[in-house]
């Protein structure tokens, strides 16, 4: 616990700048740092409706007014230990940080890029909107952060993601004018995160914003190059600095006359951008600041652009073909669990590919991915072993309620779920299992958490060690 209040850690230069920016609102802004933090979660609506989530969630939640699938939860709750979280039914996210993805109108079937995606806050939201159709490219330049990104995409059950670890410049060579929608949540000075991460407040310097502004201007131009005509680009930061906000927006408008700044949805507490904080372009008023003294959140900035021209949904379809051995053992497994659909969609054998005994389910939209550093192309289904197929944890999480017949569903209050998540074997009553033996999906309220193998009344735990709580 810090010995100092946040306001005591804030740089005088930061406070002076905020006073100049906010004028009469400055005192309210300063007092917001003394208020308790807000905690939020976002429901995975590709798996569960908000009404159903509210019915089964075992702790109190309150809707976030400006996010249709967002909820506040109390500070003393630990949602990550809840079986519903381990089933990928919700994601923990700071409330104002939910806003960028919610303001980018993604439609199933589109090609979507999250350029600086780790740890997956926005990518999981975009993937849920695509609902298994189209292509999500989730990229991060940091290898370690990209691994965290992959884990969250797998936890959310996203089947159509291409997770890359690339520089934006190299990515752009492979995807010129390829994406219908792009989200650029740029690396920033994090002024909207000071209450959450005190080190950011302690280490803040005026020079940091100027340095980051140069990077952000480079990134936003690279993003524009990858956006197809008629496509939308959402730029966001979690900072208040004009150098990283209005000035970056101005830079794009000055250098790309084919990009237009659009109006964002209005909500009480949204604050319009200030043209004078950029190059004076009157359209900067269409960008939006989220300040902590006006909303229940830490703070954010966002701007939505449209590229001139018309767009379409035409894309190259994936055309993999499983080898005979893969098809034989995978087909037997799918029959054993009674697979009806995968992620609510018919299983497509043309998307199955085997690489070194690992079986993948490719995104429905293909592309030229040669020469790119990637962690995952599509869904990792499992491994070919000697005379059998062994399913993966991402495969289990990609399945939705009703996708398979061989299930053991327990109520969210059942302590056996916690024991399963710790790697323990479970005792299962005959009436609780769909079949007398074999592979089953263990579910919470019908929503898959992971696989197990039933032998008599014992469910052998197949929850991987690296996923256990």
Regions found by a protein language model. Name each.
Residues 39-98:
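Conserved AdoMet
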Residues 1-21, 25-54, 298-301, 308-469:
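Polybasic, low-complexity RNA-engagement segments
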Residues 144, 180-221, 238-245, 271, ...:
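Mobile active-site "lid"/loop adjacent to the S-adenosyl-L-methionine
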Residues 109-118, 137:
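Conserved class I S-adenosyl-L-methionine
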Residues 179, 232-235, 240-360:
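Class I S-adenosyl-L-methionine
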Residues 139-177, 184:
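S-adenosyl-L-methionine
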Residues 130-131, 227-229:
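Helix-to-beta-strand junctions that scaffold the AdoMet/dcAdoMet cofactor pocket
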Residues 119-132:
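Conserved SAM-binding loop of SAM-dependent methyltransferases across substrates and taxa
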């Amino acid at each position: 616990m810090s010995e100092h209040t946040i306001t005591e850690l804030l740089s005088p230069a930061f406070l002076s700048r905020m006073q100049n920016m906010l004028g009469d609102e400055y005192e309210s802004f300063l007092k917001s740092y003394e208020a308790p933090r807000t905690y939020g979660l976002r429901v995975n609506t590709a798996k569960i409706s908000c009404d159903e989530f509210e019915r089964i969630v075992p702790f109190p939640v309150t809707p976030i007014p400006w996010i249709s699938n967002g909820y506040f939860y109390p500070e003393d709750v630990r949602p990550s230990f809840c079986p519903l979280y381990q089933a990928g039914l919700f994601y923990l996210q700071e409330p104002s940080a939910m806003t960028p993805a919610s303001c980018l109108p993604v439609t199933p079937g589109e090609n979507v890029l999250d350029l600086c995606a780790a740890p997956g806050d926005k990518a999981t939201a975009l993937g849920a909107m695509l609902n298994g159709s189209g292509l999500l490219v989730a990229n991060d330049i940091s290898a370690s952060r990209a691994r965290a990104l992959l884990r969250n995409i797998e936890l959310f059950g996203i089947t159509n993601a291409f997770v890359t670890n690339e520089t934006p410049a190299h990515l752009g060579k492979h995807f010129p004018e390829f994406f219908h929608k792009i989200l650029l949540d740029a690396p920033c000075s994090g002024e909207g995160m000071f209450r959450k991460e005190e080190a950011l407040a302690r280490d803040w310097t005026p020079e940091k914003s100027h340095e980051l502004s140069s990077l952000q201007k480079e990134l936003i131009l690279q993003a524009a190059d990858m956006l197809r005509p008629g496509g939308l680009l959402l730029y966001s930061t979690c900072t208040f600095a004009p150098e990283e906000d209005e000035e970056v927006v101005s830079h794009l408008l000055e250098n790309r006359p084919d990009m237009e700044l659009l109006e964002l949805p209005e909500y009480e507490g949204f604050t319009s951008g200030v043209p004078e904080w950029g190059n004076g372009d009157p359209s900067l008023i269409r960008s939006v600041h989220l300040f902590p003294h006006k909303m229940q959140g830490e703070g954010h900035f966002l701007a939505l652009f449209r590229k001139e021209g018309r767009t379409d949904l035409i894309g190259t379809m994936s055309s993999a073909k499983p080898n005979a051995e893969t098809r034989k053992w995978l087909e037997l497994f799918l029959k054993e669990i009674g697979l009806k659909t995968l992620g609510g969609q018919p299983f497509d054998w043309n998307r199955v590919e085997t690489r070194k005994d690992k079986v993948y389910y490719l995104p429905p939209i293909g592309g030229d991915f040669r020469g790119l550093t990637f962690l995952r192309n599509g869904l990792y289904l499992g491994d070919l072993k000697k005379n059998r197929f062994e399913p993966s944890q991402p495969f289990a999480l990609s399945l939705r309620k009703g996708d398979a017949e061989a299930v053991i569903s327990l109520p969210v209050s059942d302590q056996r779920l916690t024991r399963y998540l710790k790697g323990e074997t479970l005792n299962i009553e005959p009436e609780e299992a769909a079949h007398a033996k074999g592979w089953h999906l263990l579910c919470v309220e019908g929503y898959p958490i992971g696989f197990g193998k039933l032998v008599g009344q014992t469910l052998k735990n197949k929850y991987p060690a690296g996923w256990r709580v």
